[in-house]
Regions:
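Glycine-biased, small-residue-rich flexible motifs in mid-sequence functional cores and linkers
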Residues: 1-120
Length: 120
């Protein structure tokens, strides 16, 4: 499988933890996500998530705010950020981590792509 990367994958990113959850985040979910991500960043883990609304977004934002590294695994090409409101966040992630996709540029964020991404 070929991976497309925007940003840098470092050796230290092998020490990573995935943080995923509901797109319809509850206030408690937001609080707990921030708490856990802060602790993982303190322990020098790279945060990996999918750039989706909700828990994924909070995980990436918290990692960046705490000075940690984060990697977003997309269900589209690197040139099509989904959801669109995370475009600025995606730019920040590419500077302080990486955007990764199994799909070439031009690939739209179709439901089947997210399902395949989640299995690989």
């Amino acid at each position: 499988m070929k991976l497309y990367i925007l940003g840098k994958i470092l050796k230290k990113d092998a020490r990573a933890i995935a943080v995923v959850g509901s797109r319809l985040m509850t206030p408690r979910g937001e609080i707990l996500t921030k708490k856990f991500v802060k602790e993982f960043v303190k322990k020098d883990y790279t945060i990996v998530s999918g750039l989706a609304r909700g828990i994924d977004t909070v995980a990436h934002q918290t990692a960046l705010r705490e000075g940690g590294r984060t990697i977003a695994v997309l269900g589209s090409g690197l040139d099509i950020i989904y959801p669109f409101e995370n475009k600025v966040l995606a730019e920040e992630i590419s500077k302080h981590g990486a955007l990764v996709s199994p799909y070439p540029n031009g690939t739209k964020p179709l439901p089947k792509n997210f399902l395949a991404r989640n299995r690989e």
